Swiss-Prot record:
Binding site for ATP: 213, 232, 248-256, 297, 333, 449-450, 455
GO BP terms: gluconeogenesis
Family per similarity comment: Belongs to the phosphoenolpyruvate carboxykinase (ATP) family.
PANTHER family assigned: PHOSPHOENOLPYRUVATE CARBOXYKINASE (ATP), PHOSPHOENOLPYRUVATE CARBOXYKINASE ATP
Protein's gene: pckA
Chief location of this protein within or outside the cell: cytoplasm
Keyword Aminoacyl-tRNA synthetase belongs to the record: no
Name used for this protein in its record: Phosphoenolpyruvate carboxykinase (ATP)
Organism, scientific name: Shigella dysenteriae serotype 1 (strain Sd197)
Cellular compartment(s): Cytoplasm
Catalysed reaction, written as an equation: oxaloacetate + ATP = phosphoenolpyruvate + ADP + CO2
Length: 540
C-alpha cells in the first residue's frame, strides 16, 4: 500500500500549500473519532462524545450557510454562462469576484494551511461515473474531514488508486480577509469559487454545509450545460422500479415524505437526471435534528450513532442530547453515511427514470389544495416559482404568513438562469412520460396544518396511480385540477374552499396569494419562454 496513496507534499505545492510534513490521507472513521476527541484540542476543533455514540461539534457563529459571502470569479469561463447577481431581474447570491481578488484570497488560505498537519479527503460528487466530480478536500480540522467523508461518495481502494481530482476545496476556516473593505466585499469571511482553476476557497466560516452546498452549486453549473437535470430534491423507488422525486424548500417534508417503508431511498437532497435515470450526488444525509424524537422520526434518530457527526446540538454533562434546545441555532444538524438508513438503494444510489415529480409547498395562507395535477406549462410555472410560506409569530400573537419564492426550489444553489433548469427538467419528464403534482403540506381554512396521515395517503395515491384515474374539477383563479375523492383522504379537505366558513374568505386570501405569485413571476418575463408561461399561473 502506498503511503497516502502516493499523495506527496510536492503535490500540495501545486495548489500553493508549502512546508507540509504530515498528511492524513482519507482517514478511517476510527482515526477521525480519535482525532476529534483528542483532549488537547480547543475551540471549535474539539468534539464531544454523546451517549448515542456520535461525536458532536460546534461551528461557532456560523450555524448555517453565509450566502452574502459567496463569490464566483468572473472571467472568460463564466462571464456569459453564470446567473450573476448584478444582471437581470432575478435576485441571487452569485456575486462576481475579480481574478486579482481571488489570488489574494487564495494566498490567505494557502498561508493558513501551509506548515500544518493536514487532512486530505478524496471523494466523489455524483453516483454516475460518467458525470461525477472527483473532489479533493483539504482542511486542518479533523471533523471537517469527517463531514465530507460522511456527505460525499466514498471511493473504493481501486478508485482511489487512480484518483485524479477535478475540483479542489481548500478549507481555511481559521483565516479571514482583513482587506475586505478595500476589495468591496461583504465581510472578512468568504466562500469563493473559480471555475477556470476548478477550486473552492473557504475562509472565516466553520460551517460544514459550505463544502456540501459548494459542490452542489458546481454540479448545478456543469450538468445542465450537458443536458442533465440537476435537482434540489429527494428521491425514492418502489418495488416495481418506479421512481419519484420530491422537490421542496426547507420544512415542506422532503426528507419525511421520501422516507417511506414501502420504498427504497435514493437520496434526501441532491440528485441528477441523465439518459440512464435519477442518481444521488451524495454518499450521506444531512438531517435537521431540532425537536427530533425517536417516536416521530425513528430512521433519522437511529442513524445517529458512531460515525455520525452532530452539529450545534446541546450536549448535557452526562452526554445526553437535548434535541429540543435551539439556543445555539434552530438549524441543528447531523451528517451520517447513507448506509445508516436501512431501506436504501444498494450498492449505488441510483435508479431509473422518474415517472412522478412532486412539488411540495407548505402554504401558510391556506389557499392551495392538498394536491393538484399539473399540466406541462403549470409544471414549469410552479417549478420556477418555488413557493412556500411560513407562519411567523408576532408579539401580539397574530400570525401572518411570510411567503418565500425560491426558483427551482433551491435558488440559493443555482449557477445558471432558472429557466435553464426548468427546460432540462421538462425535457427529461417528457422523455420519461412523467407527471407532476403540487402537494400542499401546509394549512387550510381550519387554521390547522394538513395532517401527515392525509398527506401520506395523497402521496400513496400519486405513487400507485389512483390519483391519475380520479375525476377532477378546476379550482378557480389558480386553474388547478383537483381530484374529487382519493382513498384514505378526508374528501372535505380536497377543495380548500370547503375548509372555510364561507367561500368569500377563501376568495379574499386567494387574491392576496395570486398577486404574490404574479408579482414574483414578473422577473422571468424578460425572456420569451418565461413570458409564455404567465398564462399557466394564477389569474386575477
Amino acid at each position: 500500500m502506498r503511503v497516502n496513496n502516493g499523495l506527496t507534499p510536492q503535490e500540495l505545492e501545486a495548489y500553493g500549500i508549502s512546508d507540509v510534513h504530515d498528511i492524513v490521507y482519507n482517514p478511517s472513521y476510527d482515526l477521525l473519532y480519535q482525532e476529534e476527541l483528542d483532549p488537547s484540542l480547543t475551540g471549535y476543533e474539539r468534539g464531544v462524545l454523546t451517549n448515542l455514540g456520535a461525536v458532536a461539534v460546534d461551528t461557532g457563529i456560523f450555524t448555517g450557510r453565509s450566502p452574502k459571502d459567496k463569490y464566483i470569479v468572473r472571467d472568460d469561463t463564466t462571464r456569459d454562462t453564470f446567473w450573476w447577481a448584478d444582471k437581470g431581474k432575478g435576485k441571487n447570491d452569485n456575486k462576481p469576484l475579480s481574478p486579482e481578488t481571488w489570488q489574494h484570497l487564495k494566498g490567505l488560505v494557502t498561508k493558513q494551511l501551509s506548515g500544518k498537519r493536514l487532512f486530505v479527503v478524496d471523494a466523489f460528487c455524483g453516483a454516475n461515473p460518467d458525470t461525477r466530480l472527483s473532489v479533493r478536500f483539504i482542511t486542518e480540522v479533523a471533523w471537517q474531514a469527517h463531514f465530507v467523508k460522511n456527505m460525499f461518495i466514498r471511493p473504493s481502494d481501486e478508485e482511489l488508486a487512480g484518483f485524479k481530482p477535478d475540483f479542489i476545496v481548500m478549507n481555511g476556516a481559521k483565516c479571514t480577509n482583513p482587506q475586505w473593505k478595500e476589495q468591496r466585499l461583504n465581510s472578512e469571511n468568504f466562500v469563493a469559487f473559480n471555475l477556470t482553476e476548478r477550486m473552492q476557497l473557504i475562509g472565516g466560516t466553520w460551517y460544514g454545509g459550505e463544502m456540501k452546498k459548494g459542490m452542489f452549486s458546481m454540479m448545478n453549473y456543469l450538468l445542465p450545460l450537458k443536458g442533465i437535470a440537476s435537482m434540489h430534491c429527494s428521491a425514492n423507488v418502489g418495488e416495481k422500479g418506479d421512481v419519484a422525486v420530491f422537490f421542496g424548500l426547507s420544512g415542506t417534508g422532503k426528507t419525511t415524505l421520501s422516507t417511506d417503508p414501502k420504498r427504497r431511498l435514493i437520496g434526501d437532497d441532491e440528485h441528477g437526471w441523465d439518459d440512464d435515470g435519477v442518481f444521488n450526488f451524495e454518499g450521506g444525509c444531512y438531517a435537521k435534528t431540532i425537536k427530533l424524537s425517536k417516536e416521530a422520526e425513528p430512521e433519522i434518530y437511529n442513524a445517529i450513532r458512531r460515525d455520525a457527526l452532530l452539529e450545534n446540538v446541546t450536549v448535557r454533562e452526562d452526554g445526553t442530547i437535548d434535541f429540543d434546545d435551539g439556543s445555539k441555532t434552530e438549524n441543528t444538524r447531523v451528517s451520517y453515511p447513507i448506509y445508516h438508513i436501512d431501506n436504501i438503494v444498494k450498492p449505488v444510489s441510483k435508479a431509473g427514470h422518474a415517472t412522478k415529480v412532486i412539488f411540495l409547498t407548505a402554504d401558510a395562507f391556506g389557499v392551495l389544495p392538498p394536491v393538484s395535477r399539473l399540466t406541462a406549462d403549470q409544471t414549469q410555472y410552479h417549478f420556477l416559482s418555488g413557493f412556500t410560506a411560513k407562519l411567523a409569530g408576532t408579539e401580539r400573537g397574530i400570525t401572518e404568513p411570510t411567503p418565500t419564492f425560491s426558483a427551482c426550489f433551491g435558488a440559493a444553489f443555482l449557477s445558471l438562469h432558472p429557466t435553464q433548469y426548468a427546460e432540462v427538467l421538462v425535457k427529461r419528464m417528457q422523455a420519461a412520460g412523467a407527471q407532476a403534482y403540487l402537494v400542499n403540506t401546509g394549512w387550510n381554512g381550519t387554521g390547522k396544518r394538513i395532517s401527515i396521515k392525509d398527506t401520506r395517503a395523497i402521496i400513496d395515491a400519486i405513487l400507485n396511480g389512483s390519483l391519475d384515474n380520479a375525476e377532477t374539477f378546476t379550482l378557480p383563479m389558480f386553474n388547478l385540477a383537483i381530484p374529487t375523492e382519493l382513498p384514505g383522504v378526508d374528501t372535505k379537505i380536497l377543495d380548500p374552499r370547503n375548509t372555510y366558513a364561507s367561500p368569500e374568505q377563501w376568495q379574499e386570501k386567494a387574491e392576496t396569494l395570486a398577486k404574490l405569485f404574479i408579482d414574483n413571476f414578473d422577473k422571468y418575463t424578460d425572456t420569451p419562454a418565461g413570458a409564455a408561461l404567465v398564462a399557466a399561473g394564477p389569474k386575477l
